[in-house]
């Protein structure tokens, strides 16, 4: 009845869905009580106020249909008749609109005519304030500005050294001019000796300062590199589960590896080349003093360098993008193949996998070759411009010398100065190509760093958990356009109660526990522990007090003791052994040569499946959590190991709330209460013998199947 009542107020339904899209939980009844004062549904003004109260930034606009593709979606299409709906995507190529019908609770694809018939020109754009802050602080090249400011003293030292290097670069051509025009003409050997010694001193200082500049600059960029690497890893571990579930492992690894490209660019000659280019204005002034005509030739060549880069860059960027995509595909396929090596060998499908790898590798090599060819063409184009300018300067300079407007020494000095000007330009042309690749790397890495971390409406570290759990009117789906996983689930679990949850695959059993761990926020309703809404709780505080054992558990490449004491490496050995005994793992650990110091290998490869599972159970128990979740935890155990754990179950459950999810009904038959789920709803609940009395019930049906 309550859900139907909410469905009548489509504005409230839309607000609930958009809030969930932005990882914000709300209580519809509370919103209705505060903002729907006349009981007729949310008005436009009250809707905007309600959104603001949820830390959402909402704006009412009027937009023509032809410009809808420019707005941020999803957005709410506001209708004066109350028949609001969500606009999810605009397909401009096919003139189609992906919408979400709030009344029918289903996505719809509308044609141009159908959309025009129901669109009244009013939109409400919605974004979270956290998203706005995130956009302002998004990862791009501006991220390095605070780092430059932080290490401004070091960069100032680099700038000072660069000034001296440019002065030395300016002095050297003057020495050559004096030698050509004065020393050779007047046969001044003493002057020649003085100039030679001075030039040698300048060269020594130039070499020392150049090396010092490279050292100081590399040292500062290495610090920035460490900061970026640390920030990247912290951010990666703070991302929500949904980020990893929607991306391939290899793709994520490939994006993280793009840090190497950025590192190489920064620690190279990028910024030093820019500094050298800035000092070129001084060289131009000296060159103009020597010969305005020759200087104009040099200046006239600069637009050609720029135009050539403008022509090459878009093509190069597209090819680099394609190269990265193929590299990410290869990385993902390689990770998948290594992870599934047992299956590949067991099914003897190595030839098929090799064939797929060969095709993908060939595509990557071809894409990489196209990038190399285009980069080579770009470099050769720059060389062509440089050589052409050199020939023109040689011809024009010779004419000026012959006509007496320029001395030979001045011509040589001018050519040396022009080399000092053109060299940074050529380096920048090469760096511009590198910059295109780094731009791709920044974009790819930004997919990680710009993704919002787990968000919540506060960081409430509540008191120690007692164990009362409440699911109220829970409605949940993993995506707005995905099927409903949980529908109007209401469940009360008392402190210290042992609850078994059974049902067919896909009935929503594991999803309940994910909501309890706050991996996701329900679309509607509340999850409470000891009366506290988990939407307001600090996820780390919550998860430290919940023990979880899954069907497939991952062990780290460390010792058994370190794996069990993962959350508290300094815990006493007695606690580790006690947890291992409860999990039935102590006996087999004692038989190992290194005992608790045995390294388990990557993902626990050095142990059997049952042994890994028992260590995972010990890891969940070692912190004495007040809530314990067993999600098919014993399904991978042999009967003897399962028997040991079931014998210890009374001790395991003592003083804590336990949720047992199982397909094997024998695992849950002694539970205080058994919850039976079907298609996201609770269809039965009671004790084992009570449920068997209903011969037409799902539990009896599953029990009969297992008996047979």
Curated annotation (Swiss-Prot):
It is a multi-pass membrane protein. One of its GO terms (molecular function) is ATPase-coupled lipid transmembrane transporter activity. Keywords: ATP-binding, Cell inner membrane, Cell membrane, Membrane, Nucleotide-binding, Translocase, Transmembrane, Transmembrane helix, Transport. Its EC number is 7.4.2.5. The chain crosses the membrane at residues 159-179, 192-212, 270-290, 296-316, 389-409. CDD domains: ABC_6TM_CyaB_HlyB_like (cd18588), ABCC_Hemolysin (cd03252), Peptidase_C39_likeA (cd02417). The keyword ATP-binding applies. GO terms for biological process: protein secretion by the type I secretion system; proteolysis. It comes from the Bacteria. Residues 469-704 form the ABC transporter domain. Residues 1-126 form the Peptidase C39 domain. GO terms for cellular component: plasma membrane; type I protein secretion system complex. Residues 155-437 form the ABC transmembrane type-1 domain. The keyword Transport applies. ATP binds at residues 503-510. Changing residue 351 to S: In strain: Serotype T10 / PH252. It is found in: Cell inner membrane. Belongs to the ABC transporter superfamily. Protein-1 exporter (TC 3.A.1.109) family. In LktB the peptidase C39 domain, the ATP-binding domain (NBD) and the transmembrane domain (TMD) are fused. Part of the ABC transporter complex LktBD involved in leukotoxin export. Transmembrane domains (TMD) form a pore in the inner membrane and the ATP-binding domain (NBD) is responsible for energy generation. This is Leukotoxin translocation ATP-binding protein LktB. It comes from Bibersteinia trehalosi (Pasteurella trehalosi).
């Amino acid at each position: 009845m309550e859900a139907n009542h909410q469905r009548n107020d489509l504005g409230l339904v839309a607000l609930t869905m958009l809030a969930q899209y932005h990882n914000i939980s709300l209580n519809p009844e509370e919103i209705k009580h505060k903002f729907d004062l006349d009981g007729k549904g949310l008005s436009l003004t009250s809707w905007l106020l309600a959104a603001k109260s949820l830390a959402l930034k909402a704006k009412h606009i009027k937009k023509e249909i032809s410009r809808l593709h420019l707005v941020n979606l999803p957005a709410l299409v506001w209708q004066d008749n109350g028949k609001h709906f969500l606009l999810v995507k605009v397909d401009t190529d096919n003139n189609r609109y992906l919408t979400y019908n709030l009344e029918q609770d289903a996505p719809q694809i509308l044609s141009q005519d159908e959309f025009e018939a129901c669109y009244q020109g009013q939109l409400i754009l919605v974004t979270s304030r956290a998203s706005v802050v995130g956009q302002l602080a998004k990862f791009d090249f501006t991220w390095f500005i605070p780092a430059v400011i932080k290490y401004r003293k070091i960069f100032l030292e680099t700038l000072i050294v660069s000034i001296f290097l440019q002065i030395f670069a300016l002095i050297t051509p003057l020495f050559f001019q004096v030698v050509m025009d004065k020393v050779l003409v007047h046969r001044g050997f003493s002057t020649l000796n003085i100039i030679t010694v001075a030039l040698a001193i300048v060269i020594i200082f130039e070499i020392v300062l150049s090396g010092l500049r490279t050292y100081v600059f590399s040292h500062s960029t290495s610090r920035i590199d460490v900061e970026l690497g640390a920030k990247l890893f912290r951010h990666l571990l703070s991302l929500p589960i949904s980020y990893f579930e929607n991306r391939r492992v290899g793709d994520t690894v490939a994006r993280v590896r793009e840090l190497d490209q950025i590192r190489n660019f920064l620690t190279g000659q990028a910024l030093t080349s820019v500094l050298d280019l800035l000092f070129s204005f001084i060289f131009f002034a000296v060159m103009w003093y020597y010969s305005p005509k020759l200087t104009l030739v040099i200046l006239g060549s600069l637009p050609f360098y720029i135009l050539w880069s403008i022509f090459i860059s878009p093509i190069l960027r597209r090819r680099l993008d394609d190269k990265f995509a193929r590299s990410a595909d290869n990385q993902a396929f390689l990770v998948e193949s290594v992870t599934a090596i047992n299956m590949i060998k067991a099914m003897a499908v190595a030839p098929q996998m090799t064939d797929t790898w060969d095709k993908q590798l060939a595509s990557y090599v071809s894409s990489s070759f196209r990038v190399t060819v285009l980069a080579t063409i770009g470099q050769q184009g720059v060389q062509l411009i440089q050589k052409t300018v050199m020939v023109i300067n040689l011809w024009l300079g010779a004419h000026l010398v012959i006509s007496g407007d320029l001395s030979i020494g001045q011509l040589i000095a001018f050519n040396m100065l022009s080399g000092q000007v053109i060299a940074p330009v050529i380096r920048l042309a090469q760096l511009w190509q590198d910059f295109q690749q780094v731009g791709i790397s920044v974009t790819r890495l930004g997919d990680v760093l710009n993704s919002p971390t787990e968000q919540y409406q506060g960081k409430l570290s509540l008191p120690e958990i007692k164990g009362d759990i409440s699911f109220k009117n829970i409605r949940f789906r993993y995506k707005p356009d995905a099927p409903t996983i949980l529908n109007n689930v209401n469940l009360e679990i008392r402190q210290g109660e042992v609850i078994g949850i059974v049902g067919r695959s896909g009935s929503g059993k594991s999803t309940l526990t994910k909501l309890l761990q706050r991996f996701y926020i329900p679309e509607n309703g509340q999850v409470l522990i000891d009366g506290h809404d988990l939407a307001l709780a600090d996820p780390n505080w919550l998860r430290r007090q919940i023990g979880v054992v899954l069907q497939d558990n991952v062990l780290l490449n460390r010792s058994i003791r370190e794996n069990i004491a993962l959350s508290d490496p300094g815990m006493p050995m007695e606690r580790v052994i006690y947890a291992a005994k409860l999990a039935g793992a102590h006996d087999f650990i004692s038989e190992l040569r290194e005992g608790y110091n045995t390294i388990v290998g990557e993902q626990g490869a050095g142990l059997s499946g049952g042994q890994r599972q028992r260590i995972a159970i010990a890891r969940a128990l070692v912190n004495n959590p007040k809530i314990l979740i067993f999600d098919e935890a014993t399904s991978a155990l042999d009967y003897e190991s399962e028997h040991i754990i079931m014998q210890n179950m009374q001790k395991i459950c003592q003083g804590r709330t336990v949720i047992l999810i199982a397909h094997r009904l024998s695992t849950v038959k002694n539970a205080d209460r058994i919850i039976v789920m079907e298609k996201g709803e609770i269809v039965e609940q009671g004790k084992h013998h009570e449920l068997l009395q209903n011969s037409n019930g799902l539990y009896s049906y599953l029990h009969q199947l297992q008996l047979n």
